[in-house]
A protein has these predicted regions:
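N-terminal [4Fe-4S]-dependent radical SAM core
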Residues: 5-28, 55-89, 96-125
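Short acidic, hydrophobic short linear motifs in intrinsically disordered regions
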Residues: 36, 43-51
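C-terminal accessory region of radical SAM enzymes
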Residues: 38, 311-341, 361, 365-412, ...
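Canonical Radical SAM [4Fe-4S] cluster-binding loop centered on the CxxxCxxC motif
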Residues: 117-155
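Iron-sulfur (Fe-S) cluster-binding segments and ferredoxin-like electron-carrier domains
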Residues: 141-150, 369-374, 407-444
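Radical SAM/AdoMet-radical enzyme domain recognition
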Residues: 149, 154-178, 182-296
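Short Fe-S-cluster ligation motifs
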Residues: 161-177, 427-450
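Short, small/polar residue-rich loop motifs at catalytic or cofactor-binding pockets
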Residues: 346-351
Length: 450
C-alpha cells in the first residue's frame, strides 16, 4: 500500500494523524500506525504489514482515498510527507467518529472543498442587485451609490446562470443588496432550478419579504436565511443600527409558513459573544436553523474596529461554539470549526466556489469583491470560469501558517479576513486565536472520552 497525492501527516496537540485534503478524511494513529503510514509516502508497504498494526487501518485508508493501487503505485512516490508526526494514543472525534479499532480511530470522511481549478465548480454566490434598504456596518457587498446603480436584466442573469450551470455548479446562494427588492426574484430562482442546479438558498435582511413573494419562490428555494442583530428586542442593534427584531421574527415566521426552511444568521462580534446561547434559543423557538457569521473589518474602518473581538473574546467564542455545536454542524460560517474533524488545505475559494457580483464580475468568494481578485466578467466572457484560481497558496505554502500544528484542520482560516485586516492575503487570519482555542478544547474533550 502506497499513498497517493493529497495526503498529509501532522500531529495537532501531539496526536498523530494522516489526512486526505481531497476527501477531507482524517485518521488518528498510534505511534506504530504513524510509523507504518510514514513509510507509505515513499514505499509500497505490504497490506499485511499495515493490517498487523490494526486490522481496520487498510479499510479506512481505502475508504478515505489515501492509497493508489496497481500500476499507479509503481509510478514513484505520489504522496507528499508534509510534517513528521510524533504520535500518542489517538482519539475518537466528537460528533460521530468511525472507529478503526481500539488502537486507531478514524474520523468519518467529510467533503473538503477542492483547491483544484480544474475540478467542477460546486457552489456560487449570485448577487442579483446592488440595491438595499438598509445601511449595515461591515456589509461585504456595499458599494458607492449602490441604490443608483443599474440592476442586471433577467436575460443577463440567465446568461450568468447558464455559465455557472455549464461549469458544474450545484448550489447557488442568491444575495444582494436585498434580493427581495427585485420583482422578478421568482423568475431568477426558477431558472436556476431549470438549469438543473440542485439547490438554491436566498439571503435576505428580512425587511422586504412578503407572503406573496415567498409563495412565488417556494417551489424553487430550499432555504431562506435572515440576518439578525440582537437575540431580543431589548438588545441594541450594533450592525443594522435600527431596531428590527420584531420585523425579523415576523419574516422568519412567514418563511416557515410558506413551506421554506428558515435559517437565521447573527453576526458574532465583541458585543454579543457572551450571549450566543440566546440566539440558539431564539432559533429553536422560531423553528429555524442557525449559524453565526464573523465580523470582518477593513483596515480603514474605525467604526468596526471597536466591535472586533480581541483574543480573549475569541477564546470565549471558541468555548461557546463548542458548546453550541450539534451533530457536527458548523456554528460559525466562513470558519472551519465543527465537532467533526476534516482535513483541508484551504477553503476552496476561487476553485470550488466563486461569487458573482451584481455587475456580473466573478470573484473567489463573497468576501473578496475586490478588483485585485477579479477572475473576469461573465457578461463579457462567459468562459472566464475556466480560469478559476485560488486567491492565495495552499496552507502548506503560507509562511504565516508554517509552524502551526492545526493548519491542516483549519486550512489557514479565511484569506478574506486576513486581507481585510492586514492588506496581505497571505497573512495570519485575525481569528486564528478562535480556531486554535476551539481545536484545543475539542481535542481535550475527545481525549477525555477515551
Amino acid at each position: 500500500m502506497r499513498f497517493g497525492p493529497n495526503v498529509v501527516e501532522h500531529a495537532p496537540f501531539s496526536i498523530s494523524m494522516i489526512g486526505n485534503t481531497a476527501t477531507g478524511y482524517v485518521i488518528g494513529l498510534t505511534p506504530e500506525g504513524a510509523a507504518v503510514c510514514h513509510r507509505m509516502f515513499s514505499e509500497d508497504v505490504p497490506e499485511a504489514e499495515v493490517a498487523a498494526v490494526n486490522a481496520d487501518l487498510p479499510v479506512h485508508l481505502r475508504r478515505g482515498g489515501f492509497v493508489v493501487e496497481g500500476e499507479r503505485a509503481d509510478e514513484g512516490s505520489l504522496g507528499k510527507s508534509v510534517e513528521g508526526a510524533e504520535g500518542t494514543e489517538s482519539a475518537e472525534g466528537a460528533g460521530g467518529a468511525e472507529s478503526a479499532g481500539a488502537e486507531n480511530a478514524a474520523v468519518a470522511a467529510f467533503s473538503s472543498p477542492a483547491l483544484d481549478s480544474h475540478a467542477p465548480l460546486q457552489s456560487a454566490y449570485l448577487h442579483v442587485t446592488h440595491h438595499c434598504n438598509l445601511n449595515c456596518i461591515g456589509c461585504y457587498s456595499a458599494v458607492d451609490a449602490r441604490n443608483a446603480r443599474r440592476d442586471l436584466t433577467l436575460d443577463e442573469l440567465r446568461g450568468i446562470i447558464d455559465a455557472l450551470a455549464d461549469a458544474g455548479c450545484q448550489h447557488v446562494v442568491i444575495s444582494g443588496g436585498e434580493p427581495f427588492l427585485r420583482d422578478d426574484l421568482a423568475d431568477i430562482v426558477a431558472y436556476v432550478r431549470e438549469r438543473n442546479i440542485d439547490s438554491v438558498d436566498v439571503l435576505t435582511n428580512g425587511t422586504a419579504v412578503t407572503p406573496e413573494k415567498l409563495a412565488a419562490i417556494a417551489p424553487y428555494v430550499g432555504r431562506v436565511s435572515v440576518s439578525f442583530d440582537g437575540p431580543n428586542a431589548e438588545t441594541a442593534p450594533v450592525i443594522r443600527r435600527e431596531p428590527l427584531f420584531e420585523r425579523l421574527v415576523a419574516a422568519v415566521e412567514m418563511i416557515r409558513e410558506a413551506g421554506i426552511a428558515p435559517h437565521i444568521i447573527p453576526t458574532a462580534h465583541a458585543g454579543n459573544i457572551d450571549a450566543l446561547g440566546e440566539y440558539a434559543v431564539l432559533a429553536d423557538s422560531l423553528g429555524a436553523t442557525m449559524n453565526f457569521s464573523l465580523l470582518s473589518a477593513p483596515l480603514e474602518n474605525d467604526e468596526l474596529a471597536a466591535v472586533i473581538p480581541d483574543d480573549a473574546a475569541l477564546a470565549r467564542l471558541a468555548q461557546a461554539t463548542l458548546a453550541l455545536s450539534r451533530d457536527g454542524v458548523p456554528v460559525l460560517s466562513d470558519t472551519p470549526v465543527s465537532t467533526r474533524l476534516t482535513t483541508t488545505c484551504g477553503c476552496g475559494a476561487g476553485c470550488a466556489m466563486v461569487s458573482v457580483s451584481a455587475d456580473g464580475e466573478v470573484f473567489p468568494c463573497h468576501m473578496m469583491h475586490d478588483e485585485a481578485f477579479s477572475l473576469g466578467s461573465l457578461l463579457e466572457d462567459p468562459g472566464c470560469l475556466a480560469a478559476r484560481r485560488a486567491p492565495a497558496p495552499r496552507v502548506g505554502e503560507l509562511a504565516a501558517c508554517a509552524d502551526c500544528e492545526i493548519r491542516y484542520l483549519c486550512g489557514g482560516g479565511c484569506r478574506a479576513r486576513a486581507y481585510f485586516a492586514t492588506g496581505d492575503v497571505e497573512a495570519r487570519d485575525p481569528y486564528c486565536a478562535l480556531m486554535r482555542t476551539f481545536y484545543r478544547l475539542l481535542f481535550e474533550a475527545m481525549l477525555g472520552r477515551n
